[in-house]
Amino acid sequence: NVMEDNGVSKRALVDTAMELFFSHPGLETQEKAENIFTRELDIAFSDPNLCILVYSGILLEKEGKAGTLPNLSKRSYEKDLSFIIADEVLGMSISKYISGDKGMFEYVRFDKEKPGILSKLGPFMDDVVAGIVGGVSANMYTRAIAEMDPDNDSNI
């Protein structure tokens, strides 16, 4: 797994997602949320296009650490200056690719709060991971509703 090879385990992704978990119809427990999130994460990473987007963020992070990004000094990279928005664009693209506008909404929640591993990652990888977790979280909530018992009107 390209993420694990770069220090971000599946467990870290799940734990990060669960820090902002809230009870929702069909997702009454964190255990159920973790199970659905993990399943949705596996589905997302089965898509080579997502893996390539993630890999591009990994490469950008490596180049930033080395100070070899075009028109961006190593010092500016390390400060994660606000005029650099490519990292946010990549994170939003990942979340939107996974789950459309719902994913972008969740991306913003995770990007602002920086739970779990997000607070420990560099300027590109925090947004890549926020995009993954945001998109997959949005799908988790949607999947939970879709899998509810249709005969139970008290679900919603």
Where are these regions (language model features)?
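Acidic-enriched, low-complexity/disordered segments with a strong bias for Aspartate over Glutamate
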Residues: 5, 15, 42, 47, ...
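Residue-identity detector for glycine
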Residues: 7, 26, 57, 64-67, ...
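Residue-level signal for alpha-helical context at structural boundaries
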Residues: 31-32, 55, 59, 146, ...
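Glycine-rich, aromatic-bearing surface loops/beta-hairpins
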Residues: 98-156
